[in-house]
Amino acid sequence: MYQVRRPSRSEFRPVRGLSYHLRVWGEPDPQTPPLVLVHGWMDVSASWQFMVDALSRDRWIIAPDWRGFGLTRHEGPAVDSYWFPDYLGDLDALLDQIAPDRPMDLVGHSMGGNVATIYAGVRPARVRRLVNLEGFGMPATRAAQAPGRYAQWLDEIRDCRQGTKGLQTYDDVQGVARRLMKTNPRLPADKAQWLASQWAAPDADGRWVILGDAAHKVVSAYLYRADEAVAVYERITAPALSVIASDDSLALWWKDRYTLADYQERIRHIPQLQETALPDCGHMLHHDQPVELAQRVEAFLAGA
């Protein structure tokens, strides 16, 4: 089993009608801005542990479980779909609690990188430095796709209500670990075993279930507007670092519908942008190369 170097503690905060779970390392320091880490889709805050362990020094770090993931819980009725603006609202409300008068360093991976980058453009005064780890956004869309997208959304929320969009369950934690290693062949067994115990939990019948709401699998009713994203990027005032993996995830997922060149054309609208690529890693670059990533992130955050 992986041996954690910097143990975290759990805190729960009321955020917009939810009980939000935060994984926290270190203590507040008036001389250092808080470091906020936001995870990707179908992930949890524990995903950051390997990078946190690789940092050269302690600092106050806060990593939330997004709504519908990990230990964050709705306090009202269940939902049948999720909306991207709610992540922005949750982050804004959370920061008002933990650091109301201080800009923060913000690091996001995948969906979390997309949320973090949009937030940095919408609330530029709240972000001191921004790191986007493969937060690509989505392929550009056309207005003509809207009718079909709405119909798809209606079909999928019906499926969700009928219980046909459930997540796979596993016999034991070892089964979850095998699933993680199948998805990411670079993930060693000790890390997979540790992550599995954070990413899933046994249900009342003893089956291990992913700590994620199946409603996250429902497509967004709204089309992704690349031009809107670019308009937000142009308003970012913080220095920003875009980190990509040596493996081309976009080519794997989208083929020629959305390419790395397309992403780079968009992200370069951020006024103060640096770009870097990590060797020998895939989309889960904070698992594959935590030491190298920690070094690059720390160097960037320490910049003048």
List the model feature ranges, each with a label.
Residues L133-T169:
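A catalytic-pocket lid/entrance helix-loop region that shapes and gates access to the active site
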Residues R235-C281:
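Conserved loop-alpha-helix segment in the C-terminal half of the alpha/beta-hydrolase fold
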